[in-house]
């Protein structure tokens, strides 16, 4: 009897597990079964992938030589400074500050102290470009001892 019960129970438990596994499978299929919109999206994606994969590169027979490179608009001779005048870089921000402050006041009509750090650095990069191209007046290259910093008049007595 014990053996009969155990075999019957085994059959029942198998039937239950088969039922539950089949229902699990159906739920998964239902979850993954998309709408027509999903199918359209998938087909569009695959079309895009196909288009991307069919791009062609130029053949190796049409290699360009060094002579085919486009000419630069400006040569290095366009930017040559006079003898003895060094080129500036952004590292010269503090050493050429008097010249920069004078240029700001005269060219941009603004004072150095009125600018934020970022704005001053941006304008200094413009100043450096003009300096390196030799577009500034000669007095900038000769050196400026003092420069206007603010619009404030300090009213200090001079003797």
From Swiss-Prot:
It is found in: Nucleus. Keywords: Auxin signaling pathway, Cell cycle, Cell division, Developmental protein, Nucleus. GO terms for cellular component: nucleus. One of its GO terms (biological process) is regulation of auxin mediated signaling pathway. InterPro entries: SCI-1-like. It comes from the Eukaryota. Residues 51-63 have a biased composition (Basic residues). The keyword Membrane does not apply. The keyword Cell division applies. Residues 1-86 are annotated as: Disordered. Residues 15-50, 64-85 have a biased composition (Basic and acidic residues). Disruption phenotype: Increased cell number in upper pistils leading to enhanced stigmatic structure. Impaired siliques formation. Reduced expression of auxin-related genes. Component of the auxin signaling transduction pathway that regulates cell proliferation and differentiation during flowers stigmas and styles development. Involved in the regulation of auxin-related genes. This is Style cell-cycle inhibitor 1. It comes from Arabidopsis thaliana.
